[in-house]
């Protein structure tokens, strides 16, 4: 994670003056970057949980969290602390190894997906050439953890929830990948998240992929909601049918890990929508760029710290706007049936994503 190349060189010089090896500095720098990323993700998830509670309360004409901190902002922290104090119950006739390892298999891949998310041109832990496909590939491990959790619980509801999660993931990963291929084919010829953002920046606000790939954006939006397993696509944990799905036998910190993974996945999906379709950290809205204050800020671009802070704020604003849409969708639409879920993925989204890819390829061939 290169916050500032010049800053990194200055720190290397400082460590060299202390007679410390460059390898030791690189280790410290990587550890520090990972720590900052984990802290940022944690704060982002806490804010997202608070936003969902407040938005859902507003929709249902309630007050929502109010007493745990100002406006109830630390309510999620209080809930997490409560889960830490609860007893960890393990089913007597279940597979203990699968039951214990399942939550970790669910959370770890979601954390790893943040490695390829850029918050600025140099603010990324791993700028891979296959960055977006890395996210899709690593996300496909999550249903395995859900299946392990369901099978290890020795509970029919848990097992059915795990099977539903696997079927849902397979159904919607293919349209997701095809939408990403369309973006790579049309603009950047690269799957690097940084390259995709920079390719959009060349054409300003109207160069965002949401305008160039409207069909792909719609398919990606629906598929990402299904991958997050949120209403109307929360079939793996449907309360009316499966009690709590794969979470039925879990309690304490392990139940909390599933809860955290759900919001981590939503935040990651929102960030990827921002990177792939909304121009990333670039602020390209014309009528706002004409304001005197923003003119002054961008004219002082020599200060890289200001640019970094502005880029992070822009990415977060765009991401939370998408999260707001996802939250509104959850609290306003009813749950679909399992057959409707699979039909939507295989009979609607997959042909649309394939047609969008074919249309993009034909357009590129015509330009050549």
Swiss-Prot record:
InterPro entries recorded: NADH_UbQ_OxRdtase_su1/FPO, NADH_UbQ_OxRdtase_su1_CS
Membrane-topology annotation of the record: Multi-pass membrane protein
Location relative to the cell: Plastid, Chloroplast thylakoid membrane
Keyword Chloroplast among UniProt keywords: yes
Stretches that traverse the bilayer: 27-47, 97-117, 130-150, 269-289, 308-328, 348-368
Coiled-coil segments: none
Domain of life: Eukaryota
Entries under Pfam families matching the protein: NADHdh
GO MF annotation list: oxidoreductase activity, acting on NAD(P)H, quinone or similar compound as acceptor; quinone binding
Class of the enzyme per the UniProt entry, highest EC level: translocase
Record's catalysed reaction(s): a plastoquinone + NADH + (n+1) H(+)(in) = a plastoquinol + NAD(+) + n H(+)(out); a plastoquinone + NADPH + (n+1) H(+)(in) = a plastoquinol + NADP(+) + n H(+)(out)
Entry keyword annotation includes Electron transport: no
GO BP, sorted A to Z: aerobic respiration; photosynthesis, light reaction
Known EC number: 7.1.1.-
Keyword annotations: Chloroplast, Membrane, NAD, NADP, Plastid, Plastoquinone, Quinone, Thylakoid, Translocase, Transmembrane, Transmembrane helix
GO cellular component: chloroplast thylakoid membrane
Annotated family: Belongs to the complex I subunit 1 family.
PANTHER family: NADH DEHYDROGENASE SUBUNIT 1, NADH-UBIQUINONE OXIDOREDUCTASE CHAIN 1
Function: NDH shuttles electrons from NAD(P)H:plastoquinone, via FMN and iron-sulfur (Fe-S) centers, to quinones in the photosynthetic chain and possibly in a chloroplast respiratory chain. The immediate electron acceptor for the enzyme in this species is believed to be plastoquinone. Couples the redox reaction to proton translocation, and thus conserves the redox energy in a proton gradient.
Subunit structure, as described in the record: NDH is composed of at least 16 different subunits, 5 of which are encoded in the nucleus.
Name the UniProt record assigns to this protein: NAD(P)H-quinone oxidoreductase subunit 1, chloroplastic
Natural source organism: Physcomitrium patens
